[in-house]
């Protein structure tokens, strides 16, 4: 059995800003990111590319052309716990405290995560039985992946 472990937050951030750049280049305008969930053009492209990019990764790195028919690859999206619950907060005061400033500067709408958690990921898990999510209450996705590597 082969495994593909993906840090879901990283994947979401990457897709989000890739779509922002795509829209900037294709329309020569900056997309309205005030309430990204209401931006139909952005959300349609985000949903489309979330799956399409995953399938491209699977094809290029694992040689799988039809994920729905594959039985030898398991894809695990590791989810971050909420920032307030990260175990490192107990040891490092202000851990990731500067992230809010960066989000405001970059116009990142964190509601995209709720969209991915409640809509995009469940649809993919229903469509492709080889896709799963993994979550630990006080751990970030990269911590989860580090532990999973030792277990599989």
Residue ranges and their predicted role:
Residues 2-152:
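Noncatalytic, basic helical substrate-engagement surface that gates or grips nucleic-acid strands
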């Amino acid at each position: 059995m082969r495994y593909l472990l993906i840090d879901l937050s990283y994947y979401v951030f990457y897709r989000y800003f890739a779509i922002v750049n795509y829209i900037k280049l294709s329309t020569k305008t900056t997309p309205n990111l005030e309430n990204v969930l209401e931006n139909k053009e952005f959300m349609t492209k985000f949903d489309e590319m979330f799956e399409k990019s995953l399938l491209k990764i699977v094809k290029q790195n694992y040689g799988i052309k039809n994920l729905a028919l594959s039985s030898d690859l398991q894809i695990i999206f590791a989810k971050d716990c909420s920032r307030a619950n990260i175990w490192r907060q107990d040891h490092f005061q202000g851990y990731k405290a500067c992230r809010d400033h960066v989000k405001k500067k970059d116009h990142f709408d964190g509601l995209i995560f709720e969209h991915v958690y409640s809509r995009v990921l469940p649809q993919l898990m229903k469509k492709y039985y080889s896709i799963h999510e993994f979550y630990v209450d006080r751990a970030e996705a990269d911590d989860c992946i580090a532990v999973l590597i030792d277990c599989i």
